[in-house]
């Protein structure tokens, strides 16, 4: 995790908790390395911070097969589309929209390069970051039915939460050095 260590060091003091959590959530736990790093890659991509994504990709590529990284990136891309679409349908709450076919291609969801259950876990984590209740519920059911435990789901969402917070914190790093209005006036 040498590259992520550099990210942790770049986080500003207000993100001290995120520094500590970033180190902790990527340690071995209930998830396999492929699951842990796939979730990290997918959620770093969903967080849209190039620096974080580059660091996570570098560390992940040293730990897992290329197919896992490819699936994680594909999950982030597919869920960027699906989370908007299904969140809209859920928020509007009209049966007429729910009856309309999505007509959105999602072939990778059906035929991932590596593990189907892992791909669904990556999609679940991205959906949590993107706030799509419908997708979170759907993917959670699939991964549990596929043999993952609630502890594994919980661990994946913890990783997603911390990676998202790290992306936000990296953005804050640029503002931490900016003097406040009160300090500038004084």
UniProtKB/Swiss-Prot annotation:
Keywords: Antioxidant, Disulfide bond, Oxidoreductase, Peroxidase, Redox-active center. One of its GO terms (molecular function) is alkyl hydroperoxide reductase activity. InterPro entries: AhpD (IPR004674), AhpD-like (IPR029032), AhpD_core (IPR004675), CMD-like (IPR003779). It is an enzyme of class 1 (oxidoreductase). Its EC number is 1.11.1.28. The active site is at residues 132, 135. It comes from the Bacteria. Coiled coil: none annotated. One of its GO terms (biological process) is response to oxidative stress. It catalyses: N(6)-[(R)-dihydrolipoyl]-L-lysyl-[lipoyl-carrier protein] + a hydroperoxide = N(6)-[(R)-lipoyl]-L-lysyl-[lipoyl-carrier protein] + an alcohol + H2O. Disulfide bonds join 132-135. Belongs to the AhpD family. Antioxidant protein with alkyl hydroperoxidase activity. Required for the reduction of the AhpC active site cysteine residues and for the regeneration of the AhpC enzyme activity. This is Alkyl hydroperoxide reductase AhpD. It comes from Anaeromyxobacter sp. (strain K). The gene is ahpD.
């Amino acid at each position: 995790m040498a590259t992520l260590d550099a990210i942790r060091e770049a986080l500003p003091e207000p993100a001290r908790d995120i520094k500590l959590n970033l180190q902790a959530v990527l340690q071995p736990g209930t998830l396999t390395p492929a699951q842990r790093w796939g979730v990290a890659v997918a959620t770093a991509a969903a967080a849209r911070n190039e620096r974080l994504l580059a660091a996570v990709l570098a560390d992940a590529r040293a730990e897992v097969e290329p197919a896992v990284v490819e699936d994680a990136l594909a999950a982030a891309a597919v869920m960027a589309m699906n989370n908007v679409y299904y969140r809209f349908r859920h928020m509007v709450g009209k049966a007429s929209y729910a009856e309309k076919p999505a007509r959105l291609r999602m072939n990778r969801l059906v035929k991932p390069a590596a593990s189907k259950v892992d791909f669904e876990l990556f999609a679940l984590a991205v959906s949590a970051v993107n706030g799509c209740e419908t997708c979170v519920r759907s993917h959670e059911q699939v991964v549990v039915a596929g043999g993952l435990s609630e502890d594994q789901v919980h661990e994946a969402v913890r990783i997603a939460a911390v990676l998202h917070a790290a992306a936000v914190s990296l953005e804050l790093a640029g503002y931490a050095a900016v003097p406040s209005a009160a300090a500038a006036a004084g």
